[in-house]
Amino acid sequence: MPDTIAAIATASAAAAVGIVRLSGAETRCVLAALFTPVDGRSAAELPPRRMTYGTVRDAEGRTLDHALAVVFSAGHSYTGEESAELHCHGSPVVLQEVLRAAFAAGARQARAGEFTERAFLNGKMDLTEAEAVIDLIDAETAEAARNAAAQVDGALRRPLEQVYDALLGLTSRFYAVVDYPDEDIEDLTLAETERTLTESLSLIHI
């Protein structure tokens, strides 16, 4: 995934604050082309996870907004890549102009769900957690939101990992006994198999 993506991360309605998000290897270069910190530093030198105030400009040097920028180092961001956010005034027109400036600086439009896709591909979340992000966004009740948030936090992943480990151990023992009958390997009993399967089913509430 060599390209750097950009998108508006907040709703398309007017609000006090709107966010433009960047992710990819060239994030700092794109950010440096857009954003000038108030202290005159290059945006490429910003420390991670610290808000910095400055000016957002387009390729012609015209001021688009005064905003806060924050960068996240690869491995410590939502996507697992070098990432950044520009917290601008929440006018849809302003956000679109900032996004166009990001494209002019080398980013491309992110596909729907691509930030979460990259998080999944980079090992920042598994498939259950990635799907839960969608459920959390689409939640229409407080209970649905709580359930989705728990899954994002690994509530489904952890028991599935336990089930996977238990079944892997079971099948490994089975194949060892079958493939090496002359070795001193303890037979896998029916009772042990039933106990492992019952415990596994209870973990996933089937």
Where are these regions (language model features)?
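Charged, amphipathic alpha-helical linker segments immediately N-terminal to NTP-binding catalytic cores
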Residues: L160-E199
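Extended, Lys/Glu-rich alpha-helical coiled-coil stalks
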Residues: I134, A150-G169
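Conserved small/polar residues in nucleotide/adenosyl-binding loops
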Residues: I204-I206
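A glycine-rich (often HGG/GG-containing) alpha/beta subdomain
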Residues: M1-R146, A150, G154
